[in-house]
Amino acid sequence: MGFNEFIGKLFGNKATRDMKEIKPWVDKIKAVYPEIAKLSNDELRAKTVELKKYISDSAAEEQKKIEELKGTIETTELEDREGIFAQIDKLEKEVLEKYEKALDDVLPQAFAIVKDTARRFSENPELVVTATDFDRELAAQGKDFVRIEDDKAIWQNHWIAGGNDMVWSMVHYDVQLFGGVVLHKGKIAEMATGEGKTLVATLPVFLNALTGNGVHVVTVNDYLSKRDSEWMGPLYQFHGLSVDCIDKHQPNSDARRRAYMADITFGTNNEFGFDYLRDNMAVSPKDLVQRKHNYAIVDEVDSVLIDDARTPLIISGPVPKGEDQLFEQLRPLVERLFEAQKKLATQYLADAKRLIASDDKKDQEEGFLALFRSHKALPKNKPLIKFLSEQGIKAGMLKTEEIYMEQNNKRMPEATDPLYFVIDEKQNSVDLTDKGIDLITGNAADPTLFVLPDITSQLSALENETDLTEEEKLAKKDELMTNYAIKSERVHTINQLLKAYAMFEKDDEYVVIDGQVKIVDEQTGRIMEGRRYSDGLHQAIEAKEGVKVEAATQTFATITLQNYFRMYHKLSGMTGTAETEAGELWDIYKLDVVVIPTNRPIARKDMNDRVYKTKREKYKAVIEEIEEMVKEGRPVLVGTTSVEISEMLSKMLAMRKIEHNVLNAKLHQREADIVAQAGQKSIVTIATNMAGRGTDIKLSPEVKAAGGLAIIGTERHESRRVDRQLRGRAGRQGDPGSSVFFVSLEDDLMRLFSSDRIASVMDKLGFKEGEMIEHKMISNSIERAQKKVEENNFGIRKRLLEYDDVMNKQRVAVYTKRRHALMGERIGMDIVNMIWDRCAYAVELGDFDNVKMEILQTLAMEVPFTEEEYNKMRKEDLAEKTFEAAMNNFKRKTDRMAQIANPVIKQVYEMQGHMYENIMIPITDGKRLYNISVNLKAAYETEGKEIVKSFEKAILLHTIDDAWKENLRELDELKHSVQNASYEQKDPLLIFKLESVNLFDNMVNKINNNTISVLMRGQIPVQEPEQVREAAPEPQAPRQQYREEKQDLSDPHQQAAAEHDTREVKREPVRAEKTVGRNDPCPCGSGKKYKNCHGQNA
């Protein structure tokens, strides 16, 4: 007995322990279920109202205290408000804790209600209940599943979802109740494909929606979010819970705001994230769409939290400098360089073949060196890959590589200097050699055009020059830094263009559609709309392909999906495959993965991998296997890793006259139709990775008899998870099926990470071309290679998250302060803190004249102490004295502002109040005039104090936005510059953390300084009532100036999962929408005409 088995026997494995913990909950649900099943339809709905009340009452006391405290804010002195807000925050936390406890109390009843509602819909074509206002509202909106007859609402059991007429036929199994408990507890439920994850989510969604705080159901693409909101919606709406989907409405619209106010909101991960960013660019509270982040269930959670983890959401705008033409200018040089390297690599390969075939040992050594050079020149060269698969060749080349790698790569330049540039596939890097630099510099006047100067030694040499004045030194320094920045940009552009030519292949990593370069998601084969490679790489590919190079942009707001989802009070997720990444999900998100057993045992047969020497043999074997399956009458799903391979297999099948469908990034519009047919007899479907497709393949009875769906993988993926997802397409709900992967030593995974050992095994066993090896040892070896890649990818993601965590702390602080300013409730408290900060800063300046100047410039007042007092008193006391004087000065000025404005406001309101909602009030700080928009009614009711609040808000928002935008740019530049620290044996992350603190402090000082200096000087020029004019609407920045994108910061060969599905939805049947004539009876059942009832606003 092994150690792990012994420990397992002693303590039980994790799956057993998880089930043991959840089973009592499921037993409770099953115990209350008979009682719930006995209730009439009306009683069942009344039960939901009862549970809502129970939850609401559990924290009623705390809610009452919060309202009381909020009522005291306006009458409390500014300095003392902080204590009230701290109490409110503490009480709000207590409310959430009370709600969680109450939810646990009612869980068995709530889950039983959902299960029995599902049963009633599946067993009855119609459910008749007493009509409520909510039922009438739904009927008036034209929902096809409910109609009103007198005082009754008739709910049907079929409705339109995703363009299809769905008849409800599902009831929750016990394993789905297990899954529901796991999700409610804030964990990840791993459930096999076909186990009904969508139905499982109805349980915790219903339960948590009872609080009224909102539940977000997050999907990976807009087709699924719309379909699921329509499919599951009536189950919730039957119980009076509102349901909406943000993807059905335009950003920043009232409809989207209403969608967030619904009890249950569906949407894609991107749109939730972008709405958060847009909210933090809003200039008025009425522009906000989201409310507090309460509870989210993420579908395909591994795809969102792991694959998308290196992909920040970014809202950017145009940069003031003109369009950058550098990529266009340098493209011909790089093209020449690439062609020269291609010739060189071909020559080295020809020399290698000739020399290795010789009997002379010296010739053979020379031959393997030439082969190694050809490999370093262009590792993806197809003739090279084919030659490396021959017996003993790869082993010989690896031996040569070891010789040159000895003593920390000491001899490597001997091998690589004859090349123009060197490619390292594993590191995803391209480095120019001196020979390459000479070629692109050519006849240029400056031979150092593409060589970065040693800026450190140049600067220290400048410091030591004695014959220059300080001013001349500064001018020279500026010149050096400018020259360095220009050259750095030029070298960076060359490097990115080289990557575009040498490491990115069209129709593999990207496609060109309608004159645009679009990234293909390597996990799912979908086009990733709106996503661009970062760091100039996308522009480089655009230049290579001869399409329009997009202009450079500047970031206005950004967040990674991980940091967005960490804001939720409670987070859970569902997926078919998370166990392999359980460590990462726990490490980063503290999310526990619980594997839910299948409802029926899996009958799928998973076979060992079949390994061939070359891709040609592998594809030949794949076609023969497909042919065999078609003869047996089994449907076949062929999983490929790129568009190119799917098209090549399609041509091979067409030559054999085998009918088939292709599903890839170029043909995704037909996806739903193709998947619907994929389970029919002898149907062959070729699909680029099926991860996250969200549609089950259903089998006909004759197919089940023939052996079920056959899955054929044409290549092992870097991630075991994607392979498991492909396998999981077969064998749903106990159906028969099989899966097998065909692998060749030329595949990327094998070439980069695993094939040395397998190649030597095949050589020893004397395998000839065309022969195949199938052994558990080989499959294990491939899995080890995948683990190696996964660990490497985890390291990259963790590192990126550590960088983003630094930015996230700053983002939270800035956005909190911005929200205070926007809502106006806590703005006074923030301004008091800013004034204190400026006072404390001023008294620390050391020299009395400097202190005097600082107080005069920032606080717009005389220094409140003498020079003698300054030298004698403690700094804390001086700060306190200055603060007291500053606050008195500030109150006097704001009171004066309100007094001057009030007579004018009073007159305008009383005489023209019906004409204006908002008016413009001009305020000046002596340098510039600010036109402040103020609500006329609020200004009248507060005797002018609202003007002060609006002035404070406008100045603070403007200052924060400018400073944050600048800070983001500086953080971006810092992130690039700290990477050089690794050459000095320093940790770039540590340097980044230290430097970013300085940047943040500078930004906070800038915000405080600029805000206070304007507020302290603000005054209203005396104005006559007839000069008052109506305020224009708040200036929301024009949307066309902004670009919303997901930038991919990752290695292109480890792309993240798709999030935008633009498939064509089938035409809806005519009966989907009920049109009501203006004079027809209103569908709500009120008896009034439609035009006089719900049709008034239509």
UniProtKB/Swiss-Prot annotation:
Keywords: ATP-binding, Cell inner membrane, Cell membrane, Cytoplasm, Membrane, Metal-binding, Nucleotide-binding, Protein transport, Translocase, Translocation, Transport, Zinc
UniProt region (Disordered), positions on chain: 1024-1098
Binding sites annotated in the UniProt record for ATP: Q176, G194, E195, G196, K197, T198, D696
Residues binding Zn(2+): C1082, C1084, C1093, H1094
Residue stretches of biased makeup (Basic and acidic residues): 1041-1051, 1058-1077
Family membership: Belongs to the SecA family.
Protein name in the entry: Protein translocase subunit SecA
Gene from which this protein is expressed: secA
